[in-house]
């Protein structure tokens, strides 16, 4: 049985240098190899013309460059593109490309499904299967860059920003997310600045503390409620790490970080008559008084079977005005890609749920139906 080849997309620069040293090659070759992979989009060692033939043969014998394949894509009327990415065993994750006048953002997934159970999120309703590997995370960027055209082909960087806001909770896959973000930041990798790579979390406090010790990227936090009572329902991990504990961890991260320019991005999905009253806006403003932040108000994007509705524009406007009375920076996020179910909270993919969450939900619904009949 032949030895499984090492996928170079799984290795950040230190990892690739260590591999080359173990192979008896000079570590500086790692920079050259990474440039071929991430700047030129090369997956064939024979195309790496500044590496000698013997080394190319040695690499081909032990290594490979394999990214997950795009199985399908949909393009929205606003230019947003949602990609279905095959990660094996009949499973898919979703990745979303969002073009704007001054940037091109890719929303990247970190897990097959999600281990958290946020009640307003379509991904959460699908259950959870596993963490994505480093190559499956950076492979989303690599594959979409191929689709759009690499910088060396087009003269322009196809993706200027990456947000870890796709399927999954990134901090529950820290071992793979950190090396993947290292590749995003590395000048020999995708070469993005630390302010252009954003990790979004629902509040895994111990992992957030670890994150601040190993990497500096922009941080976004999913709050969605102004108090623990409501957040326990909307974001159940709050029962383990309540708001004050989460906010303290955010402040600790900000003390270590330069990428955030001293403030965190707070995400707050607007659910009609659930978390969008003016009283709740006052409560949220007071909650955040000691945590420097920019607040993104996100109109809820309904999905089939969702128990919530989207707040009206007038309720969102009133909520925003209250927050601004406290001198808070508030942005009402423009919904992108909702006509192809690519908007915030709508990503679902194709998941073999190991938690049996979806099956349990369907059984409960059928039992309710039988009782009512």
From Swiss-Prot:
Keywords for this protein: 4Fe-4S, Cytoplasm, Disulfide bond, Iron, Iron-sulfur, Metal-binding, Methyltransferase, rRNA processing, S-adenosyl-L-methionine, Transferase, tRNA processing
Instruction: Please give the catalytic activity noted in the UniProt record.
Output: adenosine(2503) in 23S rRNA + 2 reduced [2Fe-2S]-[ferredoxin] + 2 S-adenosyl-L-methionine = 2-methyladenosine(2503) in 23S rRNA + 5'-deoxyadenosine + L-methionine + 2 oxidized [2Fe-2S]-[ferredoxin] + S-adenosyl-L-homocysteine; adenosine(37) in tRNA + 2 reduced [2Fe-2S]-[ferredoxin] + 2 S-adenosyl-L-methionine = 2-methyladenosine(37) in tRNA + 5'-deoxyadenosine + L-methionine + 2 oxidized [2Fe-2S]-[ferredoxin] + S-adenosyl-L-homocysteine
- Per the record, the domain of life is Bacteria
Described purpose of this protein according to its UniProt entry: Specifically methylates position 2 of adenine 2503 in 23S rRNA and position 2 of adenine 37 in tRNAs. m2A2503 modification seems to play a crucial role in the proofreading step occurring at the peptidyl transferase center and thus would serve to optimize ribosomal fidelity.
This protein is called what?
Dual-specificity RNA methyltransferase RlmN
Positions annotated as active site in the UniProt record:
94 (proton acceptor), 344 (s-methylcysteine intermediate)
Record gene name = rlmN
Any idea of its EC number?
2.1.1.192
Requisite cofactors: [4Fe-4S] cluster
- Lineage, highest ranks first: Bacteria, Pseudomonadati, Pseudomonadota, Gammaproteobacteria, Alteromonadales
Major location (coarse)? cytoplasm
Is S-adenosyl-L-methionine tagged as a keyword?
A: yes
Q: How is the cofactor bound?
A: Binds 1 [4Fe-4S] cluster. The cluster is coordinated with 3 cysteines and an exchangeable S-adenosyl-L-methionine.
Query: GO terms for molecular function, please?
Result: 4 iron, 4 sulfur cluster binding; metal ion binding; rRNA (adenine(2503)-C2-)-methyltransferase activity; rRNA binding; tRNA (adenine(37)-C2)-methyltransferase activity; tRNA binding
Q: Which SUPFAM superfamilies does the annotation name?
A: Radical SAM enzymes
What other comment is given for this protein? Reaction proceeds by a ping-pong mechanism involving intermediate methylation of a conserved cysteine residue.
Share an example GO biological-process annotation for this protein.
tRNA methylation
Q: Where is the Radical SAM core domain?
A: 100-339
Naturally occurring in which organism (per UniProt): Shewanella amazonensis (strain ATCC BAA-1098 / SB2B)
Indicate the family of this protein: Belongs to the radical SAM superfamily. RlmN family.
- Which InterPro entries does the entry mention? Aldolase_TIM, Methyltransferase_A, RlmN_N, RNA_MTrfase_RlmN, rRNA_lsu_MTrfase_RlmN/Cfr, rSAM
Which compartment or compartments is the protein found in?
Cytoplasm
Task: Name the positions where [4Fe-4S] cluster binds.
Answer: 114, 118, 121
Record GO cellular component, one term: cytoplasm
Which residues are connected by disulfide bridges in this protein? 107-344
Indicate which residues the UniProt annotation says bind S-adenosyl-L-methionine: 168-169, 200, 222-224, 301
